[in-house]
Swiss-Prot record:
Species lineage: Bacteria, Bacillati, Bacillota, Bacilli, Bacillales
Family note: Belongs to the FapR family.
Superkingdom field: Bacteria
HAMAP family membership: Transcrip_fact_FapR
Alphabetical list of SUPFAM superfamilies matching this protein: Thioesterase/thiol ester dehydrase-isomerase (SSF54637)
A GO term for molecular function: DNA binding
UniProt protein name: Transcription factor FapR
Cysteine disulfide partners in this protein: none
Cross-referenced InterPro entries: HotDog_dom_sf, Transcription_factor_FapR, WH-like_DNA-bd_sf
Gene name for this UniProt entry: fapR
Amino acid sequence: MKLNKKERQKLLQQTISSTPFITDEELATKFGVSIQTVRLDRLELSIPELRERIKHVAEKTLEDEVKSLPLDEVIGEMIDVELDDQAISILEVRKEHVFSRNQIARGHHLFAQANSLAVAVIDDELALTAKANIKFTRQVKQGERVVSKAKVASHDKEKGRTVVEVNSYVGEEVVFSGDFVMYRSKQK
């Protein structure tokens, strides 16, 4: 069933509100319209393009929150963090991240994104990876966007260890998962 313009724009607004990192291409597929139609709808509704939406979300003073490493050392663009709870980053897979012969992302970039996010979520000036159990579930290609989500699973104050679960997605598909045992000072 094809939606009329007013209905489509209402759903577009709701979709972007609930999923701010959705691309125009994904929206076009979802609503069965052209990318240009999605862009025109966004303009009419004064909804910024994806990059601007990402920047807007990231302006939640991440610089003041992350203690364990400088933000420019986080692989990917960190867009949300709640220390000792959860964090999110986005990595746009570009030419420099892939093998030239097949445009498949090199695994160490996906690991680095997840590992740096596991470090960044720790509410401590000292956070080091003690152990990692990781799994790559599918190849990632050039041009894809990897959204990595870290969640603190447990914290052992006596041992100074925190377990952080990280899952990385392309769209809704898990492409990488890992459990990171993080060493931290025993003060927290």
